[in-house]
C-alpha cells in the first residue's frame, strides 16, 4: 500500500491538486452557500480525470511494464484498484477542503431553510456524496480509456469531450435528470427535488461496468 501511495500520489500531483482547489476558491464567485457545489463539481471532474489518467500508464512510461507482466493478473488488478482508491480518497479530501475554502475566502450568504442551522450541514454531506460519485466516475473512466489506448493523453482527451458535452445547456436539455452533471443542474429553489440522483446512478452504473471491463483490457493491452 505504501509503495502504491508513493507511485500514485507523487508530490507534483498533490501540489497541483491543492493549487487547483486554492485558485478555484479564489476566482470562482458564489453569492450563496448552496452555489458552492455547482461551482466545484465540474472543475473537480476535470481534476479527477487528469489526476487519475496515469494510474496504469505510468508503468508503460517508466518502462516497468515488462516486469509488471510477470506478476499475476490478480496481483496487478489489486494494485491498480488500490491506486485508484488512494487517489480518489485524496481527491475527495481536496473536495471537502475546497468547500471550506469558499467560506473562508468568499464568505457566501448561508442559505438557511426550514431546518435552520442543520440545513448547511446536510447540504455539505449531500455535496460530499455527489462529489464521491463524480470523482469516482471520471477517475475510473479516464484510467480505463488510458489503459485501452496505452496513452494517458487519450484518456484525458476522451473525458474532456464527454465533459464538454454533458456539462452544457445542450447536455442538460438532452439528458435532463440523467445527465452526468445532474447535481450541478439541479433546481436550487426546491430542496426536496432529488431527481438529480438519477444522473449519479448512471455514473455509478458506468463506473461499475468500467471496473469490470478493466481486467480484460489490462490482459490484452497491458
Locations of regions flagged by a protein language model:
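Secretory targeting signals
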Residues: 21-54, 81-152, 187-190, 198, ...
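Helix-loop-helix units of permease transmembrane domains in multi-pass membrane transporters
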Residues: 53-89
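Terminal transmembrane helical anchor/hairpin motif
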Residues: 30-32, 122, 147-222
Amino acid at each position: 500500500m505504501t509503495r502504491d501511495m508513493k507511485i500514485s500520489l507523487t508530490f507534483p500531483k498533490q501540489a497541483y491538486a491543492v493549487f487547483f482547489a486554492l485558485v478555484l476558491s479564489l476566482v470562482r464567485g458564489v453569492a450563496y452557500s448552496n452555489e458552492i457545489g455547482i461551482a466545484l463539481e465540474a472543475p473537480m471532474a476535470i481534476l479527477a480525470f487528469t489526476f487519475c489518467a496515469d494510474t496504469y500508464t505510468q508503468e508503460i512510461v517508466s518502462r516497468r511494464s515488462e516486469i509488471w507482466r510477470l506478476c499475476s493478473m490478480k496481483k496487478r488488478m489489486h494494485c491498480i484498484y488500490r491506486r485508484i482508491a488512494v487517489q480518489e480518497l485524496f481527491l475527495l479530501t481536496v473536495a471537502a477542503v475546497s468547500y471550506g475554502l469558499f467560506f473562508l475566502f468568499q464568505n457566501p450568504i448561508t442559505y438557511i431553510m426550514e431546518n435552520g442551522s442543520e440545513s448547511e450541514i446536510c447540504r455539505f454531506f449531500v455535496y460530499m456524496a455527489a462529489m464521491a460519485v463524480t470523482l469516482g466516475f471520471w477517475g475510473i473512466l479516464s484510467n480505463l480509456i488510458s489503459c485501452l489506448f496505452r496513452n494517458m493523453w487519450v484518456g484525458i482527451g476522451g473525458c474532456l469531450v464527454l465533459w464538454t458535452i454533458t456539462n452544457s445547456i445542450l447536455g442538460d436539455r438532452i439528458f435532463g435528470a440523467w445527465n452526468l452533471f445532474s447535481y450541478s443542474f439541479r433546481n436550487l429553489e426546491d430542496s426536496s427535488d432529488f431527481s438529480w440522483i438519477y444522473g449519479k446512478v448512471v455514473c455509478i452504473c458506468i463506473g461499475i461496468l468500467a471496473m469490470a471491463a478493466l481486467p480484460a483490457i489490462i490482459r490484452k493491452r497491458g
